Amino acid sequence: MADDEGEEDPGINNMGNLLQVISSESEEEDEMELEDAKTADSESPNIINFDTSLPTSHAYLGVDMEEFHGRTLHDDDSCQQIPVLPHVQVMLIPGQTLPLHLSRPQEVSMVRGLIQRDRTFAVLAYSDGLQREAHFGTTAEIYAYREEHEFGIETVKVKAIGRQRFQVLETRTQADGIQVARVQILPERVLPCPMTSLQLDSQSRHLLFPTNKPVSGRSPQSKCQWLHKYRRRKFLGASLTSWPSWLYALYDADSLMERVKLQLHEWDENLRDDSLPANPIDFSYRVAACLPIDDALRIQLLQIGNAIQRLRCELDIMSKCTSLCCKHCPDTEITTKNEIFSLSLCGPMAAYVNPHGYVHETLTVYKAFNLSLVGRPSTENSWFPGFAWTIAQCRVCGSHMGWKFTAVRKDLSPQKFWGLTRSALQPRIPEPDEGEMGHDHSPILCL
């Protein structure tokens, strides 16, 4: 990712400008500003008047992009030959939007050919930057396209969306240099409700689920009350088995979705339930795309073949994760889960691309710690219109962590926030008690 490759070219860590050299006085001012951010008023803004639809539109790519309609879906378990974009180092989740800015002649030629066919390419999932072979991936379908010619250089800007998971069978390189993968499309296994075989006609009237589901914005207490009533009615047949009803609820999609939503509201109190997918499969993928976890955990979520197990793993991650630390120095805490909030319709984290073609999955948080700022604020190619960005680095190891965004207008809320790149973060769980700490204890989450 860009945080590793940025050491070779400092210009690729920003959103468009070359890294600006500033005086030591400016650096001291930035340090003072950061200290103020840690000790200032800790209250988060109650009202966000920023248009959250702007980041999802990716307007920085241009407004006159050619849009395509329809979608391409391959049959489950079918084998397909799909071209691969080799330099896209993003672990794409189905349903996740992927913006691209391609300038290599081979990639430009490949995208042109895709536009004439099914507009589908493969994004391989690498668990780390040193892995040479990928075993899983996701198909991506282009839904918006723009071609540019400037100074004799041809570039294409693309908006794509993840569609289906696949397992890589083999890869080969064609005579024109384009890599093609032979993949098997992985199906989504829909598990039946365990109560289906226990439903008796005489009890059918008791199986009507409560319809007064709490709307978005209601208190957690009302949601818990609804969930309790839902479980009591849906798992009425559990009395005929040797297993308690709460055990069936652990594998019920609707119950898991409500529990995940409660966790999401702890991460983002402004989240609206009606903005989330109602389908368990789509919902599980939306949550997976928003979790600030490393690639090792994300690829495990990508391998799971049913929504229920995926939701259970996501719930485990969210309940254990309390803070995020620097990936290169894990003892350095960067932010906590209470600081996460959504400034986009996609949720607290989404993928964005800079003019150099590097894709950053950026997590928005109110406050961050142990960071130093480099350069001066700039609004050029800002992913959040109305905000100026400043490069942020880890104060301990100096690795690129993301950006600080400051509002250019006083009437814009929030006035400032941080955008942290997922590739530089590592989730961490609290240290256990001294008596429970074993020799192999690690604060890093694992499934």
Curated annotation (Swiss-Prot):
Region entry Disordered: which residue ranges?
1-47
Q: Which residues bind (S)-thalidomide?
A: W383, W389
List the protein's name: Protein cereblon
Per UniProt, what is the name of the gene that codes for the protein in this document?
crbn
Main site of residence? cytoplasm
| Disulfide bridge map | none
Tell me the subunit arrangement.
Answer: Component of a DCX (DDB1-CUL4-X-box) protein ligase complex.
Q: What does this protein do?
A: Substrate recognition component of a DCX (DDB1-CUL4-X-box) E3 protein ligase complex that mediates the ubiquitination and subsequent proteasomal degradation of target proteins, such as MEIS2. Normal degradation of key regulatory proteins is required for normal limb outgrowth and expression of the fibroblast growth factor FGF8. Maintains presynaptic glutamate release and consequently cognitive functions, such as memory and learning, by negatively regulating large-conductance calcium-activated potassium (BK) channels in excitatory neurons.
Family assignment from sequence similarity: Belongs to the CRBN family.
Q: Which GO terms describe its biological process?
A: proteasome-mediated ubiquitin-dependent protein catabolic process; protein ubiquitination
Start and end of every Lon N-terminal domain?
82-322
Matching Pfam families:
LON_substr_bdg (PF02190), Yippee-Mis18 (PF03226)
PANTHER family annotated for this entry? CEREBLON, PROTEIN CEREBLON
The record's annotation in SMART domains points to:
LON
GO MF annotation: an example: metal ion binding
Q: Which residues form the CULT domain?
A: 321-429
Q: What domain of life does the UniProt record list for this protein's source?
A: Eukaryota
GO cellular component terms attached to this protein's record? Cul4A-RING E3 ubiquitin ligase complex; cytoplasm; nucleus
Question: For bias kind Acidic residues, which ranges apply?
Answer: 1-10, 25-34
